[in-house]
Swiss-Prot record:
The modification Phosphoserine is found at residue 311. PROSITE patterns: TPR, TPR_REGION. Changing residue 542 to G: RNA polymerase III defective. GO terms for cellular component: cytoplasm; nucleoplasm; nucleus; transcription factor TFIIIC complex. The gene is TFC4. This is Transcription factor tau 131 kDa subunit. Component of the TFIIIC complex composed of TFC1, TFC3, TFC4, TFC6, TFC7 and TFC8. The subunits are organized in two globular domains, tauA and tauB, connected by a proteolysis-sensitive and flexible linker. Interacts with TFC1, TFC3, TFC6, TFIIIB subunits BRF1 and BDP1, and with RNA polymerase III subunit RPC10. InterPro entries: Tfc4/TFIIIC-102/Sfc4, TPR-like_helical_dom_sf, TPR_rpt. Phosphorylated. Keywords: DNA-binding, Nucleus, Phosphoprotein, Repeat, TPR repeat, Transcription, Transcription regulation. Changing residue 192 to L: In PCF1-138; increases RNA polymerase III gene transcription. Pfam families: TPR_16, TPR_8.
């Protein structure tokens, strides 16, 4: 410390004498000087340094120090005289320490030289002594240029001359060349390595010049020489903290705190480091220890007060004298209230840092950062506040669920009303910053009413004094998705010019966007862009607002700009990284320290601790659950009140439900790896994005293309499932219903493909596909959507999937026929040989179950519950297979299976119709010798079909029977009889569908017979528009 004062005095005196024409060193000297410094930099390379006080961050992986460089160093620093082996070794160790080299152990000799023995005073060469004398004289007369030149000459001839380096540094300091001064003193310190005070001067100067690495090294040398130099430990710890070396900074402050646990500044720094190191609970514990110590002290004061009257006057007088010698540093209020107690004894036994409102404010912030102990935080803050206000006896407030003790609501409390007047007159108001933090904790527990009660106290304060608290409350409300309330606290900030920034415009615009006030949102997003035109996130949000305002041109234009700017920013980042090294290499050499900061090992922030991740997960899950429940309730109300009759109303419903489904789909736990695949529908479950901005650009790009893409999760996430029946506030059955309803509504009102993608996502969810009933429902919903598509292959695949899963199920077989009742795609599927082979294998599988034997070519048995003791056949399988054979013109084969059906269901109209048509078509193929007999046989079945329809069915089926019989006669050329049945269709029934077909066929017959007038009449009556 004395050396530091000496340097300052010397600087002040010399500065007064310094002439105005003091110039820079000549070019030759400067070149020589920096040439030397470059040599020294090469010498100060990074190897392992053995001293435990020197930080390991200074250890670099370089080549080992070799003997050639040792020799060159000695040659440069040689005084042209013989030097002892010990002198050589000591000096080399000093240079190795300067460059973080490993210090070599001294060789043992037979002389028994003791370790650490002082070396003899060096004898200077006469020439060097003469130059040094001349340099000192020039320095004294303030001829700094001459002095600098002479000292450089001294260093050339005697590179180990401490005085030359030290005084040369003084000259640079007077000239304002502080970096050169620091470098010179740094070398001088190595030549006088045992002077820790000089090391400290160099360390402080290095820190002032922001030469962090060099400053840390110098402070480490100070601490290694004087482990009790607490200022150096403090300064080095602050440098560690600055460079992100949290573990080393924490170690330093822990040592300081152990040495002086009553320094509030050290306590605060240690608490901050604990927070930075993700040890928030340790920070809270520090302040709780201080609080408990204060509680214990107050209890001791109250106990001592009872015995104060028994103490002697002499003892009190002695204590008064001692008190005069050492004034108390804290608890002045206690001394004023209780002046007669034995304060000497209290201070000696119960010394502690005072716990006041400032300490409580810090404690409240720590509980906010902890995020998982809001309830405990609220209780602790209330307890501490009562203690500060000397109301610690009012413990009944601990059982009050709200914070009414701090406002006028306390007068409604019966227990408070029964207190003594002295207790009621005590202070109950808390500082506004603590009240706001208490409100933030309440908000984190989803107690919005109590939180707003605290925030509204801001209205009673001078606005300019608490503007930052307005912003803090508004930001927290935005984070909690209470957008309308957040607007109330953001809006007043606009009246202050210093708050009209992007930090306010951006969240305020988001709030207006969320409440669908898009015009106002657009205004604030535009203001934010004026403040920060390169912020792409704001531009993306504004583009989305234009989309919501039905301005597609501006939306697409902004989106193109954002994409281009994003590419440009990525290119700029890569270019900047590639140029960093070259820019560092070309920096001015005169501004570099000997130990360059660029050689620091790159600091990597430590990974998040499991505790930190768990805390964030709990907080996030709580917010998501509240959002899910809220949206679900809104969706239910909308469904009940508005219905889904209009496409516009359906779109609103779809938007709400899509957000819920996206939240569910983001949970990676639900998707088995073996079943996961890329998903390209409205729910992008497998695509991952590097940043939120990339996701937003991708999503808006889909909107620009007209796709139905809704905002969803950014990336897959893994969630700890704590319940087997629900997720995020909804039961799995409710989630399943949302998926199914959403798929059907989207398929109906928007896009069949998007509706199908929702079902496919649900089929990949393990909690769904492990439930047989849900699996059945998903397959039928998917079939219902596929039926709206004109995709023959997709329909056939889904039908086969159903038939395989629900093997031999008659309802599923009915669904198969219902699904293929119209259109050319249905006929193509029925006539496909693939379907014929599929059902033949199913028939064989059924027969194997029926006769309890293996059948060659049968399908695998998936239905293990087939019970057929009477060995009955399956009419559904026979009928479907017969239809497939009939559709592919295999009439004879079809008749074989239809004949088997006739035995079981002789009065089924469709069996008789198919048998009749099969006989007729077989006869028309001219592949039988008795064609006319087969036609008669076919007509017999057709008349039976007609009779069954006429006697047992409605007019619609009767009309169908007349038409089919007429069409059969038309086929075999008996047109007069065909016309009779066609006329029945035209005249006896009201339904017009078959009338058009009957009229068209009648027109063909009349035209062939030459009756054009009657044909025109039918054309005009039935086929004209």
């Amino acid at each position: 410390m004395a050396a530091g004062k000496l340097k300052k005095e010397q600087q002040n005196q010399s500065a007064e004498r310094e002439s105005a024409d003091t110039g820079k060193v000549n070019d030759e000297d400067e070149e020589h000087l920096y040439g030397n410094i470059d040599d020294y930099k090469h010498l100060i390379q990074d190897e392992e340094y053995d001293d435990e006080d020197v930080p390991h961050d200074l250890q670099l992986s370089e080549d080992e120090y070799n003997s050639e460089r040792d020799s060159s160093l000695l040659a440069e620093f040689s005084d042209y005289g013989e030097i002892s082996e010990d002198d050589e070794e000591d000096f080399m160790n000093a240079i190795r320490e300067a460059s973080n080299f490993k210090v070599k152990k001294k060789k043992k000799n037979d002389k028994g030289k003791s370790y650490g023995r002082q070396r003899k005073e060096r004898v200077l060469d006469p020439e060097v002594a003469q130059l040094l004398s001349q340099a000192n004289e020039a320095f004294v007369r303030n001829d700094l240029q001459v002095a600098e030149r002479l000292f450089n000459e001294v260093i050339k001839k005697d590179a180990r001359n401490f005085a030359a380096y030290e005084t040369l540094g003084d000259i640079y300091q007077l000239q304002g060349r502080l970096n050169d001064c620091c470098n010179s003193w740094f070398l001088a310190a190595h030549l006088n390595a045992s002077d820790w005070e000089f090391w400290k001067i160099v360390a402080i100067l290095s820190a002032d010049l922001d030469h962090v690495r060099q400053a840390i090294y110098c402070f480490s040398r100070v601490i290694s020489l004087n482990p009790m130099e607490w200022e150096s430990i403090y300064r080095r710890s602050m440098l560690y903290k600055k460079t992100g070396q949290l573990a080393r900074a924490l170690d330093g402050f822990q040592r300081l705190y152990m040495y002086n646990p009553y320094d509030a500044n050290i306590l605060r720094e240690l608490a901050i480091l604990y927070v930075d190191y993700d040890r928030i609970e340790d920070s809270i514990e520090l302040y709780m220890k201080v609080f408990n110590a204060n509680v214990e002290r107050r209890e001791a004061i109250l106990a001592a007060l009872e015995n104060a009257l028994d103490s002697s006057d002499e003892e009190s007088a002695a204590e008064g004298e001692d008190a005069d010698e050492k004034e108390p540093l804290e608890q002045d209020e206690d001394r004023q209230m209780f002046p007669d107690i034995n304060w000497k004894k209290i201070d000696a036994k119960y010394k502690c840092i005072p716990f006041d409102w400032s300490s409580l404010n810090i404690l409240a912030e720590l509980f906010l950062k902890l995020a998982v102990s809001e309830v405990d935080g609220i209780k602790t803050i209330k307890k501490c506040a009562r203690w500060i206000q000397r109301r610690e006896s009012q413990t009944f407030w601990d059982h009050v669920p709200d914070d009414s003790e701090f406002d006028n609501r306390r007068f409604k409390n019966s227990t408070f009303d029964s207190l003594l007047a002295a207790e009621k007159e005590k202070s109950y108001n808390i500082p506004i910053d603590i009240r706001v933090r208490l409100g933030l904790l309440r908000l984190n527990t989803d107690n919005l009413v109590e939180a707003l009660n605290h925030f509204q106290c801001l209205y009673d304060e001078t606005f300019s004094d608490v503007a930052d608290l307005y912003f803090e409350a508004a930001t927290a409300l935005t984070r909690a998705e209470k957008y309308k309330e957040a607007i109330d606290f953001f809006t007043p900030l606009l009246s202050l010019e210093e708050w009209r920034t992007t930090d306010v415009f951006k969240p305020l615009a988001r709030c207006y966007k969320e409440i669908e006030s898009y015009e106002t949102a657009k205004e604030f997003y535009e203001l934010a862009i004026k403040s920060e035109p390169d912020d792409l996130d704001i531009r993306v949000s504004l583009a989305e607002v234009y989309y919501r305002l039905n301005d597609p041109e501006t939306f697409k234009h902004m989106l193109v700009d954002v994409v281009e700017m994003r590419k440009h920013q990525v290119d700029e980042t890569l270019h900047r990284i590639s140029n960093e090294k070259s820019s560092n290499d070309t920096s001015d050499i005169s501004s570099k320290p000997l130990l360059e900061d660029s050689k620091f090992r790159t600091f990597r922030k430590k990974k998040r601790t499991p505790y930190d991740a768990e805390r964030e997960r709990i907080e996030r899950e709580r917010r998501i659950t509240a959002k899910v429940v809220d949206k679900y309730e809104k969706m239910k109300k909308f469904e009940l009140n508005s219905g889904l009759n209009e496409a516009k109303q359906a779109s609103i419903w779809i938007n709400t439900v899509s957000e819920l489904v996206d939240i569910f789909s983001s949970v990676k736990n639900f998707f088995m790896k073996s079943r996961s695949r890329k998903f390209v529908g409205i729910l992008r479950r497998t695509k991952k994005f590097n940043t939120e901005l990339d996701f937003q650009i991708e999503r808006l790009s889909k909107l620009a293309e007209g796709d139905s893409v809704f905002e969803g999760p950014l990336m897959e996430e893994r969630v700890t499932l704590t319940s087997a029946t629900e997720l995020r506030g909804l039961s799995y059955e409710q989630w399943f219903e949302l998926f199914m309803e959403l798929s059907l509504v989207i398929a109906k009102y928007q896009s069949v493909e998007d509706g199908l993608s929702v079902v496919e996502t649900a089929q990949e969810v393990n909690v769904f596909f492990q439930d047989p009933e849900r699996v059945k429902m998903m397959k039928f919903v998917k079939l219902a959507i596929v039926l709206q598509m004109d995709d023959e292959e997709e329909l056939a695949e889904n039908l086969r999937g159903l038939l395989n899963q629900f093997q031999f199920n008659r309802k599923v077989l009915q669904v198969f026929m219902y699904s293929l009742c119209r259109g050319p795609s249905s006929l193509n599927i029925l006539s496909s040989t693939i379907q014929q082979k599929f059902f033949l294998r199913q028939l064989k599988a059924f027969d194997s179950c029926r006769y309890n034997t293996e059948v060659n070519g049968q399908a695998s048995i998936t239905n293990k519950e087939v019970y057929n003791p009477n060995k009955k056949s399956s009419p559904y399988l026979y009928y479907i297979y017969a239809v497939l054979l009939y559709s592919s013109r295999g009439f004879l084969s079809a008749l074989q299976y239809l004949t088997r059906l006739e035995e079981d269901i002789p009065d089924d109209p469709m069996v008789n119709l198919l048998m009749g048509l099969s006989h007729i078509h077989r006869a028309m193929q001219r592949l039988t010798a008795q064609r006319h007999f087969q036609i008669f046989h076919g007509l017999r079945y057709l008349y039976r079909y007609h009779k069954i329809r006429k006697s047992l069915y409605t007019d619609l089926e009767k009309q169908e029977a007349d038409y089919n019989l007429g069409r059969a006669f038309h086929l075999i050329g008996l047109v007069s009889i065909a016309i009779e049945y066609y006329n029945r269709v035209l005249e006896n029934y009201d339904d017009g569908k078959l009338k058009k077909h009957a009229a068209y066929n009648s027109i063909i017959i009349y035209q062939q017979s030459g009756n054009v007038e009657l044909a025109d009449h039918l054309m005009e009556k039935y086929l004209s528009i």
